[in-house]
Amino acid sequence: MSFIDEVKINVKSGDGGAGCVSFRREKFIPLGGPDGGDGGKGGDVIVKVSSHLSTLLDLRQHPHQKAGRGKNGMGSDRHGANGHTLEILVPQGTVIKDAETGEILADLAEPDSSMVLLKGGRGGQGNARFKTATHKAPKFAQPGEPGEERWIRMELKLMADVGLLGMPSVGKSSLIAKISAARPKIAEYHFTTLKPSLGVVQYKNYRSFVMADIPGLIEGASEGAGLGHRFLKHLERTGQLLHLLDLSWMPDRDPIAEYEAINRELALFNPELADKRQTVVVNKIDLPHVRENLKEILPYFEERGIKVFPISAATGEGIPELLDDIAFNLWGEPEETW
């Protein structure tokens, strides 16, 4: 499956313009000296963060990007114009890697950050530059330097304060739709969410935070199983994680075993992920048998000092308390002091 969070493109900076071989041609000056101008510099390739972008879709549609070539030098000591600079706009959070080696070239995590990815070639010198006392009429000039070219891979890591994770179909999309403006596709089958989506949650006193609905994970995700490690990377920059459990399938499915399986995948992919703050959220608490099943799993989490919030994405039960806890973890102060 394909997601607009990763793209491979070819980028090339501009070639430098050639220097000119020219001699003065003026009336009454039969032996005019060299007057060939220099070639223009090739255009650089610059990558810059734009606050107006949220995907890499445009680059996927235009995989070949090229800066302008420098113009050739001209007679009468006229220099060629520099090639136009190519400015590639990307969303905040884009990581740029060499497509062949995997080397990280840039991590554009800050707003308005930018970098020169490739330098344009220098323009060649015209023959006027090579005139000496012993060589007054040079009939040669320098060619322009070629620009640089490389294949790069861009990866967009979602910038979110809170990440939702859990097995497929535990209710992550329903929760984010309930508490934010996001409207992810929702249905009763696995892997409904085929790409990560962001929702802005408006909290009290005009405060807000961003929540990422990460598609359902399964065992083996760290090795690419299911929708694979392409989703795990989106959790790396979230400040905290909400781990959703669905108790409605007990005893056919073991929610504690699923919880442990996902945490193993987090640790295998990146040990720091397993250390992130996690809050366990039990969805569908409006169903009577889920309330009964909650009593069975609570001791496991209480022994480990892990908070459990029973909520219902359908009715809204428990959601205000959950949002208060998220806000406290994000901003570290009680709501009354804001």
UniProtKB/Swiss-Prot annotation:
Residues binding Mg(2+): 173, 193
Q: Name one GO biological process term.
A: ribosome biogenesis
Q: What is its EC number?
A: 3.6.5.-
Broad class of where this protein is predominantly found: cytoplasm
Query: What are the recorded GO MF terms, alphabetically?
Result: GTP binding; GTPase activity; magnesium ion binding
Its needed co-factors are: Mg(2+)
Q: Where in the cell is it found?
A: Cytoplasm
Residue span, OBG-type G domain: 160-331
Q: What keyword terms does UniProt attach to this protein? A: Cytoplasm, GTP-binding, Hydrolase, Magnesium, Metal-binding, Nucleotide-binding
Is Magnesium tagged as a keyword? yes
Which PROSITE patterns does the entry link to?
Answer: G_OBG, GTP1_OBG, OBG
Q: Where is the Obg domain?
A: 1-159
Family matches, as Pfam families = GTP1_OBG, MMR_HSR1
Q: Which CDD domains match?
A: Obg
Subunit structure, interactors included? Monomer.
Identification of the protein by name: GTPase Obg
Organism of provenance = Citrifermentans bemidjiense (strain ATCC BAA-1014 / DSM 16622 / JCM 12645 / Bem)
Q: Which gene encodes it?
A: obg
